[in-house]
Amino acid sequence: MKLKEVTEGKVRIFVPDPKEYMIEGKFDPSWAPVFYNPKMTFNRDLSVIVVSLLKPKIILDALSATGIRGIRYYVESWKSEQLILNDKNSTAASLIQINVKNNGIENAKIFNKDANALLYEIKSEYIDIDPFGSPVPFILSSINATIRNGIAAFTATDLSPLEGSSRTSCRRKYDAINYKLSSSKELGLRILIGKIIREAATLEKTVHPLFSFYADYYYRLFVIVESGARKADENINKNLKYFGECPRCGFQTFVDENCKTKCPICGENFIIIGPLYIGPLHNMEFLKRMIDTYSDFNYLSSFNRIQKLLNVIEKEAKYKSVFYNISKLASKLKVSAIPPIDSILECLGDASKTHFAPTGIRTDKGYEEIIRCVKSLR
């Protein structure tokens, strides 16, 4: 395997040389013997900031590939007492050895095991699951392996089922009914969180989002893992419901059950999806710490993008409602000219943009008030 040295953040690692694995002049990271995706640098950059605040004693990256994620945590975030890197691909495990040594890390434990098998053998304060596709096969084992009040982090790149484009796949993987709706970018994340909550409950554990976001073609989520059957029951009863959108007028709301429910505005039957999580997507105290800290990481290649994302999330996080997609709403209302988002925000007064969609707004003001602004500004 021919290798190429690359720099990401403050580390230098060896990865398979893309030129050796091109097909008709094109390259996909999955074609190489060991997976390395430079397009996930933003994901890893933000994760470095999160881990720097958590300072876990043990870090476990269960699907390490080149080892880039765990190595960056150790070098840039926090020199944990123990760094555990694993990949079931023996070629990857050998490459991890090289990259760990190349970055002067002496206390790393490297495994060449199936991720689930390892997760049932080891407990950790911080566990990272960054798979190629869905994290579902690893949810139960990773929650089981996370100690009380520890953190589990998940990446999901299978947006087709989560956003409602592949309904049967969503039902199979996430045990949720799904349709493509106006706010599916956010609803997909809520379906993912709902699935993790239900899986954790089978272990008499529960989870609460610490920080989460959507970017490019994936969701990234950090959850606090708590123990106790009572806490699990309380979280399910309080925060797992369904979501309804009116196909005629665009009114949307959370609903208690998956049953025929009529829109209170126009009387049309709702399209119902779920179950999904309806609570806050971030821990506000932790979010404030991120905003106070991220400037220390101005060397990151995606620093400006991180700054923009956190600025938007800080504003939208205070609202409890799912965002309204003004473009889709205007279409349902037969409004030909979509008003500028900034004008709608000014009209509403108490509202913000959302990082989920460029034409989305988030507000706790009522549907009628939103419609008034959309129609008055057309």
From Swiss-Prot:
Instruction: Please describe what this protein does.
Output: Dimethylates a single guanine residue at position 26 of a number of tRNAs using S-adenosyl-L-methionine as donor of the methyl groups.
EC identifiers of the protein: 2.1.1.216
Q: Which domain of life is it from?
A: Archaea
Supply the alphabetized keyword list. Metal-binding, Methyltransferase, RNA-binding, S-adenosyl-L-methionine, Transferase, tRNA processing, tRNA-binding, Zinc
Q: Which residues bind S-adenosyl-L-methionine?
A: 44, 69, 87, 114-115
Q: What class of enzyme is it?
A: transferase
Q: Which reaction does it catalyse?
A: guanosine(26) in tRNA + 2 S-adenosyl-L-methionine = N(2)-dimethylguanosine(26) in tRNA + 2 S-adenosyl-L-homocysteine + 2 H(+)
Q: Identify the gene encoding this protein.
A: trm1
**Positions of Zn(2+) binding:** 246, 249, 263, 266
Q: Write out the similarity annotation.
A: Belongs to the class I-like SAM-binding methyltransferase superfamily. Trm1 family.
The UniProt entry's GO biological process terms, in alphabetical order, are:
tRNA N2-guanine methylation
Trm1 methyltransferase domain mapped to chain residues: 4-374
Q: Which GO terms describe its molecular function?
A: tRNA (guanine(26)-N2)-dimethyltransferase activity; tRNA binding
The question of whether Methyltransferase is a record keyword is answered with: yes
Q: Which Pfam families match?
A: TRM (PF02005)
Report the record's disulfide bonds: none
Q: What is this protein called?
A: tRNA (guanine(26)-N(2))-dimethyltransferase
